[in-house]
Amino acid sequence: RRVLFRSALYRKLTAQLGVKPEDVLHIGDNAKIDVEAAKKAGLHALLLPRPADVFMDVDCTQMANLGHGCLAGFTTADAMQPLALRCAQGLAANRFFDDGYAPATADSAFAAYPSRLGYYAVGTHLLALAKWLLCRCRADGVKRLVFLARDGALLRQAVELLRTDADAVETDYIPASRRCLLPALMANPTDWAALPVRWAVYTPEKTLKLLSFCTLDAPESELRHQAEAAGFPWQSPFQEKTRWESFLRFFRDKLYDGCRHQAAYSAARAYYEEKLPEGAACFDMGYSGRLQAALCQLTQRAVPVYYVHADGRNSERLSAAYDFPVHCFYPMPPAMSGAFREFLLSSDEAPCVGFERQNARVVPVYAQEGRNEAAHFLSTCVQHHALQFVRDFHDTFAGTGVMQSLDSPGVQLAMSLPFEGALRQLPEADAELLRSIPFEDMVFAGEDALDLRTLVRDQSAEAALAAHEMGAADAPSRMIGFIPEQTGLVKRTIGFLLFDRETFRKKLRKRMHRSPK
């Protein structure tokens, strides 16, 4: 190896072959010996990196370092140590890095491939969430777990893949959205001021469309005339919150139909009473507890809920008010939440906007809206590969200690580090995946689509600023690396002492055993 690095062997080789160095192309997997030394001898040289080198960020990609930036307060070595996470990295490396020419760049984690984002980052988190749910249901004695649309579609499939004979829980999937639960969310007049909407993007027209379930059955022209006569331009957004609140008071006094509201409430109640029987629990992404409080109000039962995380204040207040237990995967809200998390994990099916009675049965009514093909392709590809990771992990490690270790809450959280790293520190090259992807929230955004790429960038900047203001330096996404094969003897010794003392002791014992003097 030393002779190779000094280029002498390359010169001797070309001399014996009787060829000019510039006519030789040397290909190898070591950047210094196979490329730098060969070039010093005048040869052309190309690097064909080993799959493990590509995955572990040796000149190629940030993929293996995802999650490092979420580790404020403890060391990378401790957090990334669980065997299950290292096995997950092995699966990802085997799947995507068996070709040295696979596109990978130092400023990217996934080379803007949704398959890589889904398989590694989303897949590890999906596996951890599914194992957490199964463990919680087993411990809590839950026999029926209902996944609320659209957040629970993918996770339900993962739970079904991992469920064993020891897991007696049955699963179901039902629609639940702020839009279809508005009759319950607005059951009390005091709740009207706390509607989960972004009032600044609403107009009187959009507001009446949102509240159509309890608006007087009158022609739109008549509703418009009354609104404008009261000083509310039909298509002008509310400039101040006081104007929004004034319009709600006007609506309550002039345009509200209590009978239609009660009919919508009764239909929703009949549907959820059937779908959420005694002993059932729900899964929802989170966060405030409003939807769960509405479900408890409709069913007249305290229905437990499992969240990825809660927002703290509102969820605690509503949990106490409606007496429903809240169990969270994360003990505290993570730095990045909301739109991007839901986009990666939720189904892109049409949202439920209400319920209607058909032949003595209550059935959900879905929005009639066009589908964004770019968003559909991205979410479908990401979720397909995430579920494939869960399937591969189960097929490879079922019945082993690796799978059993996932019952530990600490290992479950560690498995989610790549996902949190992707949310919080998505490299710019990979953020191009989100270009032209709208995030649509019919209630919050008033049917206006939020730009997902901009939203993620803004949330990431806010998270970094919050960490800075709290006095915690945001850890970089690329940590200090130590590659013994590419380091001199003195630096290698120092590196082992700093980063891997156990390996240093083993090497020292081996060296002394070979040469005791």
Residue ranges and their predicted role:
Residues 55-74, 193-215:
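Conserved phosphoryl-transfer catalytic core
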Residues 142-149, 280-283:
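Short glycine-rich phosphate-binding loop at a beta-alpha junction
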Residues 30-45, 292:
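Acidic, divalent-metal-coordinating active-site segment for phosphoryl/phosphodiester hydrolysis
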Residues 99-105, 110-126, 184-186, 190-193, ...:
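Long, contiguous domain-sized segments
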Residues 8-34, 280:
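Conserved Lys-Pro-Asp/Glu-containing loop-to-beta segment of HAD-superfamily phosphomonoesterases
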Residues 3-4:
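Short, small-residue-biased leader/transition segments that mark boundaries at the very start
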Residues 167-184:
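Conserved beta-strand -> loop -> alpha-helix junction used to position metal-binding or nucleic-acid-contacting
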Residues 51-129:
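Flexible inter-domain linker/hinge segments
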